[in-house]
Amino acid sequence: MAERSQNLQDLFLNTVRKQKISLTIFLINGVKLTGVVTSFDNFCVLLRRDGHSQLVYKHAISTIMPGQPMQMFESEEVAS
């Protein structure tokens, strides 16, 4: 069976979702949102903070900043 490739956006969102990394999301209108991604699809991101969920449409997102360092890819050792 062929391996399905995953785009960078899905890889990033799935990593922060699985690791429950807190994010700051800036919208194109300047609004700043913070929370943890609980789910996402092709069109939106479900963000949770203080027991409340917000559905954010991806077309409204400008920037996403993780609250801590994260590793999405396996480390590759540099040959000496």
From Swiss-Prot:
Cellular component aspect of the GO annotation? cytosol
Q: Which residue ranges run through the membrane? A: none
A Gene Ontology biological process in which this protein takes part is: regulation of RNA stability
Which GO molecular-function terms appear in the entry?
RNA binding
- UniProt xrefs under InterPro entries: Hfq (IPR005001), LSM_dom_sf (IPR010920), Sm (IPR047575)
Alphabetical list of SUPFAM superfamilies matching this protein? Sm-like ribonucleoproteins
Keywords recorded for this protein, A-Z: RNA-binding, Stress response
Query: Origin, by domain of life?
Result: Bacteria
Q: Sm domain spans which residues?
A: 10-70
Its subunit composition reads:
Homohexamer.
User: What protein family does this chain belong to?
Assistant: Belongs to the Hfq family.
Q: Which NCBIfam families match?
A: Hfq, PRK00395.1
Instruction: Tell me the PANTHER family matching this sequence.
Output: RNA-BINDING PROTEIN HFQ
What does the protein in this record do? RNA chaperone that binds small regulatory RNA (sRNAs) and mRNAs to facilitate mRNA translational regulation in response to envelope stress, environmental stress and changes in metabolite concentrations. Also binds with high specificity to tRNAs.
The protein's name in its UniProt record: RNA-binding protein Hfq
The organism encoding this protein is Rhizobium rhizogenes (strain K84 / ATCC BAA-868) (Agrobacterium radiobacter)
Question: What is the gene called?
Answer: hfq
